[in-house]
């Protein structure tokens, strides 16, 4: 009876084969058909048993010459630990090569990590992002941030910034690849529970499409390995992470560029981008749109010595002005556009025990130089939020920076951000045209590493800046910050790993405020704050 049921099941399973060989089957008797099906079933069972036996051998522990080990407490360790709750080390995948059976197996082993990567690569879609959010309160009411770009971020940051990137591969054949990339970024308010975009109380809630471009590989015969892109995108940004501003930043509404083009010992990044600006008159009541374009060129990853690389960079911004726009500048009180440039170099040294340090030297003129003189955020913009209202006379500014982290022994790590800047005959938003400035800002963050997941430390920040206006009047701004913190982490690096959950207590004091007149709540010059903040990227 069992044999008849088995044969009947085999008939149902092999029906498609029988249908495809209908002409042959019509010439066979019922007994011959059953005999063929039994043979096929035996072969299938044999093949299945073969692979079951192979897998059993892989996961069956050897028993020859086994000695009993003990754990740290002196108890005998289990020589056959239970594996039912653990993830398998590998999965079997079927080979699609025609000669797979000739090599002995139509299956091969693949780790779960590799299998997951294979699935992602096959789908061609990735979702990456970043955001920060947290709770805080202060000694004089609502907590306020001050001079983050000079005193550091820990315990001085009350924003909910986010970046969300979507990337979809749309073609990957014959050595050519095409990806569509969209980046959304913005801020979610951390003060009011109603955080609707558009209902922007306090200017907190906003969002934009900062990237929307197509990137390709393999289409340029002279640079098949490079990333060639077209759309709303800019050259790569380089950030002073502890101060939350960039040493390299080229904003763009749209452009065309090439990244990671191998030339000689290094790689070239080049971008040509557009960024129109609103040029104001001196009453700041009227404006006109000026079409500007930027060429950004970098030669990077130049090897110097062991674990050291060099980058040389240059950037030039010019305007494509109409006759009427020039006439408004000459006769109707609009600010004259002045081309601006920035050149520099940076050296990155990686350390044997982990960590790195990056040193950079930058020099700029006109509107980019003006932003070197900002103590709060000093990214090299050409405008202030797209607005151009300043008299430039060819003045220059210089900036030297150091940032990085280093491990000291097995249980200590120190991060740093140090910036020295000075400029002559620049425009300052605080002291006007023909201003000079000099500033130094330093933040250090030592911490004790308890384990991979816990650190306790302090962030110390200090800055001082002096501006001198056209009449040689001097204006000083300075302050310091001390933040005690404990962090939950997933790795020991301060600057290159996230998740990070911080619990902090911060004391911040404005020593001089002659440039911005800033005060905390109740017109105080200091603030004590406590809070918790989560920061994550993926």
Curated annotation (Swiss-Prot):
InterPro entries (alphabetical): G_neg_Bact_CarbUptk_Porin, LamB-type_porin_N_dom, Porin_LamB, Porin_LamB_sf
Signal peptide span: 1-25
GO biological process: monoatomic ion transport; polysaccharide transport
Subcellular location: Cell outer membrane
Chief location bin: membrane
Chain spans, region Disordered: 52-82
Record keywords, A-Z: Cell outer membrane, Ion transport, Membrane, Porin, Signal, Transmembrane, Transmembrane beta strand, Transport
Entry's Gene Ontology cellular component terms: cell outer membrane; pore complex
Membrane topology per record: Multi-pass membrane protein
Family from the record: Belongs to the porin LamB (TC 1.B.3) family.
Protein name: Putative outer membrane porin BglH
Lineage of producing organism: Bacteria, Pseudomonadati, Pseudomonadota, Gammaproteobacteria, Enterobacterales
The encoding gene: bglH
């Amino acid at each position: 009876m069992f044999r008849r049921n088995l044969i009947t099941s085999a008939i149902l399973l092999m029906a498609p084969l029988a249908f495809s060989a209908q002409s042959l089957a019509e010439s066979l008797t019922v007994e011959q058909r059953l005999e063929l099906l039994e043979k096929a079933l035996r072969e299938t069972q044999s093949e299945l048993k073969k692979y079951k036996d192979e897998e059993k051998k892989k996961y069956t522990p050897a028993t020859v010459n086994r000695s009993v080990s003990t754990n740290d407490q002196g108890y005998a360790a289990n020589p056959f630990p239970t594996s039912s709750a653990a993830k398998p080390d590998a999965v079997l995948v079927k080979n699609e090569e025609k000669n797979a059976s000739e090599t002995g197996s139509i299956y091969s082993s693949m780790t779960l990590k590799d299998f997951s990567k294979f699935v992602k690569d096959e789908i061609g879609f990735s979702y990456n992002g970043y955001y920060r959010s947290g709770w805080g309160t202060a000694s004089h009411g609502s907590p306020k941030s001050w001079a983050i770009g000079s005193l550091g971020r820990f315990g001085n940051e009350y924003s909910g910034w986010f970046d969300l990137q979507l990337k979809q591969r749309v073609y990957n054949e014959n050595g050519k690849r095409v990806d569509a990339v969209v980046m959304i970024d913005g801020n979610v308010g951390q003060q009011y529970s109603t955080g609707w975009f558009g209902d922007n109380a306090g200017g907190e809630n906003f969002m934009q499409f900062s990237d929307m471009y197509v990137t390709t590989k393999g289409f340029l015969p002279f640079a098949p390995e490079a990333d060639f892109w077209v759309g709303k995108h800019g050259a790569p940004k380089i950030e002073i992470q502890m101060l939350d501003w960039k040493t390299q930043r080229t904003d763009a509404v749209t452009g065309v560029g090439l990244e990671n083009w191998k030339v000689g010992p290094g790689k070239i990044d080049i971008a040509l981008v557009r960024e129109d600006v609103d040029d104001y008159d001196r009453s700041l009541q009227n404006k006109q749109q000026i079409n500007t374009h930027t060429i950004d060129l970098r030669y990077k990853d130049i090897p110097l010595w062991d674990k050291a690389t060099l980058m040389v960079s240059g950037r030039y911004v010019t305007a494509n002005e109409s006759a009427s726009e020039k006439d408004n500048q000459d006769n109707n009180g609009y600010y004259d556009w002045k081309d601006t440039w920035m050149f520099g170099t940076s050296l990155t040294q990686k350390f044997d025990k982990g960590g790195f340090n990056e040193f950079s030297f930058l020099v700029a003129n006109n509107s980019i130089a003006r932003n070197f003189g900002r103590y709060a955020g000093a990214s090299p913009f050409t405008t202030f939020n797209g607005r151009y209202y300043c008299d430039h006379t060819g003045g220059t500014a210089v900036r030297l920076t150091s940032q990085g982290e280093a491990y000291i022994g097995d249980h200590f790590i120190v991060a740093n951000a140090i910036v020295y800047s000075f400029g002559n005959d620049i425009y300052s938003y605080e002291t006007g045209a023909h201003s000079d400035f000099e500033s130094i800002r330093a933040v250090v963050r030592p911490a004790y590493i308890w384990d991979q997941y816990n650190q306790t430390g302090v962030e110390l920040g200090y800055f001082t800046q002096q501006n001198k206006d056209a009449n040689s009047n001097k204006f000083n701004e300075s302050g310091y910050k001390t933040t005690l913190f404990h962090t939950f982490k997933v790795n020991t690096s301060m600057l290159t790993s996230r998740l990070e959950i911080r619990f902090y207590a911060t004391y911040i004091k404005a020593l001089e405020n002659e440039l911005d007149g800033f005060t905390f709540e109740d017109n105080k010059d200091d603030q004590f704050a406590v809070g918790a903040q989560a920061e994550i990227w993926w």
